[in-house]
Amino acid sequence: MTYIIALTGGIGSGKTTIANAFAALGVPLVDADIIAREIVVPGTPALQAITEHFGHDILTPDGNLNRALLRQKIFTNNQEKQWVNQLLHPLIHQETRRQLEQIIAPYVIWVIPLLVENNLRHLADRILVVDVSPEIQISRIATRDGINYQQIENILAAQASRSERLAYADDIISNHDNVQAITPRVAELHQQYLRLAESARQDNHDE
């Protein structure tokens, strides 16, 4: 299998910006958030199960999952959160493995927000953490998602702390305000990852 770089960070850290910078260099992406959306589109067994469990109110008028309402329900009810996780996590994991196995590039960026929380570190060859202060996270989430401070606090409380995430980092990108610094940092890491991927390929070939 291709060399796997897990790209992780808290909500509002700018993972998508960093992932897109790698994609601009021709690096393939496997994004857990996109997979999580794809497995609950209308007509999927997962969306049917969620609708049966929570009722039709959990759908938008056009039949899609009302993600904001679901998030509200599970962040205030641990039992419901566990139910949703037990339904979706195996499906996300299965589809992630399928996509990763199809990659033929030297390495892949696996965008996985809850890498630390869901104890998935063993599936990656290397971990890249997008780091940002909690204050900037809160500001970005409020602006982007239009949710209130209490909901943001609930989301942050459910995620690994900044220090926990950094403890597992092999590499770090600081994504506070200096957007100009991102491109050269990503280019530098890209070269490093190509070397690591080649070294791993040689090791596997020698075994």
UniProtKB/Swiss-Prot annotation:
Compartments where found: Cytoplasm
Catalysed reaction equations from the record: 3'-dephospho-CoA + ATP = ADP + CoA + H(+)
Binding positions (ATP): G12, S13, G14, K15, T16, T17
Signal peptide interval: none
GO terms for cellular component: cytoplasm
GO molecular function, one term: dephospho-CoA kinase activity
Annotated pathway: Cofactor biosynthesis; coenzyme A biosynthesis; CoA from (R)-pantothenate: step 5/5
EC number(s) per entry: 2.7.1.24
Segments passing through the bilayer: none
Iron-sulfur among keywords: no
Key words, A-Z: ATP-binding, Coenzyme A biosynthesis, Cytoplasm, Kinase, Nucleotide-binding, Transferase
Any one of the GO BP annotations: coenzyme A biosynthetic process
Residues covered by the DPCK domain: 4-200
UniProt superkingdom: Bacteria
Family per similarity comment: Belongs to the CoaE family.
Role according to the record: Catalyzes the phosphorylation of the 3'-hydroxyl group of dephosphocoenzyme A to form coenzyme A.
Protein name: Dephospho-CoA kinase
